A protein has these predicted regions:
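AAA+/P-loop NTPase substrate/partner-engagement loops
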Residues: 92-127
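N-terminal pre-Walker A segment at the start of P-loop NTPase domains
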Residues: 25-60
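Conserved alpha-helical scaffold flanking the Walker A/P-loop in AAA+ ATPase domains
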Residues: 115-146
């Protein structure tokens, strides 16, 4: 197989190159998602670069009005359809200086640890800021203006109760979100305790991301398993 061209600006082009090389099957649904990701790449490139700020700098910036936020993407569908592969292609190409890619539950564990650390500072008299969400959001913004999550799902009430307030801060100050999920946003935290308190986050999410489904007929995970020798 010939070495592939180094496509670093278009998910569509990289997908087509991999297909032409025989590494992937042609998949119209994947190309559709790739086109959405290319739109985000273009918007990120066109946006005026944000000045690097410390967490304290972000706290002061909160008072200066909303930042320009590039609309992100929420890709949902069954497992094995290629959602994570496409997001990873996008992440590597994203023209931003600070970005983070992780599993959603890893991110939320980090958030809860930061909230706990802030409450300890409050208890020890090291801060007078009673609400931990603004400083935690400021820390996250100082570290990454682009967040890419794998497997966005909400099953824990502690996560559910914090998401709307946290992402109100993140989105308002320029954070872009690209995420994969197995469920449509309206079914996040379905039948969860006090779900009514979680629903404002769903509305917020749909305001700042385009929601698309990856309904490829092929389960590439199963295809790989079936090709293995028994």
């Amino acid at each position: 197989m010939k070495p592939l061209p180094d496509y670093n600006h278009s998910v569509v082009e990289q997908l087509n190159a991999l297909t032409a090389a025989g590494a992937l099957q042609a998949d119209a649904a994947q190309l559709g998602v790739a086109a959405h990701l290319d739109r985000i790449l273009a918007d990120l490139k066109a946006r005026k670069p944000a000045k690097k700020k410390s967490a304290l700098g972000w706290m002061f910036a909160r008072k200066s009005g909303p930042a320009t936020t590039v609309k992100g993407l929420y890709v949902y569908g069954s497992v094995g359809r290629g959602k994570t592969m496409l997001m990873d292609m996008f992440y590597e190409m994203a023209p931003v200086s600070s970005k983070r890619r992780c599993h959603f539950h890893e991110f939320m564990a980090d958030v809860h640890n930061r909230v706990h650390a802030h409450r300890q500072k409050l208890k020890n008299g090291e801060t007078k800021q009673a609400d931990p969400i603004p400083p935690v959001a400021a820390q996250l913004l100082a570290e990454a203006e682009l967040l890419c999550f794998d497997e966005f799902s909400v099953t824990d009430i502690a996560d559910a109760m914090i998401l709307a307030r946290l992402f109100t801060e993140l989105f308002a100050h320029g954070c872009t979100l690209v995420t994969t999920s197995n469920v449509v946003p309206d079914n996040l935290y379905k039948d969860g305790l006090n779900r009514g308190l979680f629903l404002p986050f769903v509305d917020l999410l749909k305001k700042y991301v385009d929601v698309v489904t990856l309904d490829s007929p092929t389960d590439y995970r199963m295809e790989k398993l079936e090709s293995l020798p028994v």
